[in-house]
A protein has these predicted regions:
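Generic recognition of short, well-ordered alpha-helical segments
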Residues: 53, 110, 154-155, 373-377
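Bacterial N-terminal signal peptides
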Residues: 1-6
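Substrate-binding groove of N-acetylhexosamine-processing glycoside hydrolases
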Residues: 17-33, 49-51, 200-203, 209, ...
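Feature activates predominantly on carbohydrate-active enzymes
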Residues: 81-85, 90-305, 312, 390-393, ...
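Short amphipathic alpha-helical segment that frequently serves as the phosphate-/nucleotide-binding helix
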Residues: 55, 156-157, 409
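A short, charged/proline- and glycine-enriched loop
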Residues: 34-39, 135-140, 358
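Acidic, contiguous N-terminal accessory segments
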Residues: 7-103, 107, 111-131, 313-318, ...
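Structural motif
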Residues: 69-71, 94-96, 140-141, 360-361, ...
Length: 575
């Protein structure tokens, strides 16, 4: 057999296997069947299995008998594949599908539809193929951060369909105040969605093998709760609405009410993400910050277990308190130095190891340096102590109007690869919304996450970008001359702090008493012509370069639009 691997670097713009995530294919020759992509109308199951939800060319397919059906399918849990895996064989006259489970059957039809779409686009019949496909990571969720804004409700249903076609199987939704809490009505914002609406979305997602799980911040990041007058008495510091007092019993009464509403709104969820990051506490009752953090963590993990949810916890604070945090983000430090830090400070963790809840998932987030020795060592520490660890990478970090660093694809690929190597259950793609960029701008990073969490790390990043262009804009647009997203990142990044003074800090502008004086550059003095331009010469040159790049990008996008590209909506967002 000749093996044709779709994640091979020889992938070409006229290839009918332009699929994300990529699949491994074997075929005797590059032969074609007698099957017309537009004439696949009936499917038959030898075991009376039901046709899953379908898309595109298969959207209107119906059940037929054995003779009239082009597709013959069955579920067989004895096949040697992981859950969600499937075998798809395209023969001269028939298409045969054997799936490990219902989820695998759904993904087999998703893959088949993309093959049919590509055959139609290439004006060929359907290629003869033999496919055996399964995920590299079991749990492949994205993060939906609703803290700062929401989209139209219909957008989220469309998003579910988009994610399903990428074989994403989970969402962790950071609800904050975007759930209309029944138990604590003061917390839900004016644009929050009802529990009933969230149930409807959860049902829609579940039918497409996507499980929605809630994230409700607890110990810290609690301003959306503690800003309300009736909850001020629960603050850790009376003057700050950032954190709860973990020793006040009413803290848990309130938090558990929110959890119950969130669980009701996500009836199919397996997890309850409890947050817990970036919080410093007042030491009280002779307890250290680490002890206070673990008191809270144990109480909320016990609650989660009682309500049949697995708690997920951002893990940074215990590692900070123990003194092993910084090496995770330092790629300049040597392995020897990292080991010395751990040898000195690991005792700070081990002194409380019995208080680390065993039912929690410790989410080791690292968005830029996931491949550092320090980060990998921290993940191994959890596993070595029989604690469950899962990574979190990022498709959008913070404070920019579009993702940076090639949509963060190198880091996504790296963390997915190490997660597979360490045989972890999954990986989360965070998508932070601090600047409320348009969600469409996250789509390339999401596609990369789908690629490397399902198919592994064999596809080079350059080839993935080419595949993304082909898949989203058309098979004729794979060449580098049509690439523009990486170029556009540069002017967006430059404008981030273009008008800030040397000591200006953009995220903190809203908290400054007079940011126009303390953080923003001065305006020109008309009585001193030329002085301002000389002082800000570097900024002016950056602005000129930014404009030049933007004009080139605009030309490429307009060329794509005029050349009848697919996905005009995405192009219009970039434009």
């Amino acid at each position: 057999l000749i093996f044709i691997v779709s994640c091979n670097s020889n992938i070409s713009s006229d290839n009918y296997l332009n699929i994300i995530p990529t699949i491994d294919v074997s075929s005797e020759h590059q032969e074609f069947s007698n099957i017309n992509a537009q004439k696949v109308e009936y499917a038959y199951s030898t075991k009376n299995d039901k046709i899953p939800i379908t898309y595109g060319f298969l959207k209107n397919i119906s059940e037929g008998d054995s003779e009239s059906s082009t597709i013959k399918f069955e579920i067989d849990d004895s096949i040697d594949l992981k859950s969600e895996g499937y075998i798809l064989n395209i023969e001269k006259e028939n298409i045969l599908i054997t799936a490990k489970d219902q989820e695998g059957l759904f993904y087999a039809f998703v893959t088949l539809n993309q093959i049919l779409e590509n055959a139609f686009a290439q004006k060929t019949s359907v290629p003869i193929l033999n496919i055996k496909d399964q995920p590299s990571l079991d749990f492949r969720p994205i993060h939906l951060d609703l803290k700062h804004h929401t989209e139209k409700q219909s957008y989220y249903f469309d998003l579910i369909d988009h994610l399903a076609n990428l074989k994403i199987n989970g969402i962790i939704v950071e609800l904050e105040d975007k759930l209309k809490y029944v138990s604590r009505p003061e917390i839900g914002s004016s644009d929050s969605f009802s529990i009933e609406w969230w149930i409807e979305l959860s049902d829609y997602a579940k039918s497409r093998n996507i499980i929605i799980n809630p994230l409700v911040q607890g110990l810290g990041h609690a301003s959306f709760i503690l800003k309300h007058e009736k909850n001020i008495h629960l603050r850790d510091k009376p003057e700050s609405d950032w954190a709860f007092n973990p020793l006040n019993p009413e803290t848990y009464e309130l938090q558990f009410d929110l959890y119950l509403d969130a669980i009701e709104a996500t009836p199919h969820g397996k997890y309850l993400h409890i947050g817990g990051d970036e919080v410093h506490l007042v030491e009280r009752d002779n307890k250290t910050e680490l002890e206070l953090n673990l008191i809270w963590l144990n109480k909320v993990c016990e609650f989660a277990e009682k309500h049949e949810r697995i708690p997920i916890f951002w893990d940074d604070m215990p590692l900070k308190h123990a003194g092993v945090y910084n090496p995770m983000f330092d790629d300049k430090i040597s392995e020897k130095e990292v080991d010395e830090i751990w040898n000195k400070n690991e005792i700070n963790l081990m002194n409380f190891i019995e208080k680390f809840p065993k039912n929690a998932v410790y989410m080791r987030w690292n968005y830029q340096k996931s491949d550092t020795y320090g980060n990998l060592k921290a993940m191994d520490w959890y596993s070595n102590n029989e604690l469950t660890v899962m990574g979190a990478t990022a498709g959008q970090t913070r404070w920019t109007l579009m993702p940076q660093n090639q949509s963060n694809i190198p880091q996504i690929k790296s963390f997915a690869s190490s997660s597979v190597d360490k045989k972890l259950d999954g990986l989360l793609l965070t998508l932070w919304d601090d600047d409320s960029p348009h969600f469409e701008l996250y789509k390339r990073g999401i596609a990369a996450f789908a690629q490397y969490s399902w198919s592994g790390n064999s596809l080079p990043i350059k080839e993935f970008k080419k595949l993304f262009r082909i898949k989203n804009f058309g098979s004729q647009f794979g060449e580098d001359s049509f690439a523009f997203i990486d170029s556009l990142e540069k002017p967006v990044g430059m404008w981030l702090n273009m008008l800030l003074s040397e000591n200006g800090w953009r995220p903190g502008l809203s908290k400054k008493q007079n940011p126009l004086e303390s953080d923003i550059i001065d305006l020109p003095n008309l009585d001193k012509k030329g002085e301002w331009s000389k002082k800000h010469e570097v900024r002016i040159n950056n602005a000129k370069r930014s404009l030049e790049i933007s004009l080139k990008v605009e030309t490429i996008i307009n060329n794509l639009i005029q050349s009848e590209s697919k996905n005009l909506y995405l192009l219009s967002v970039f434009l």
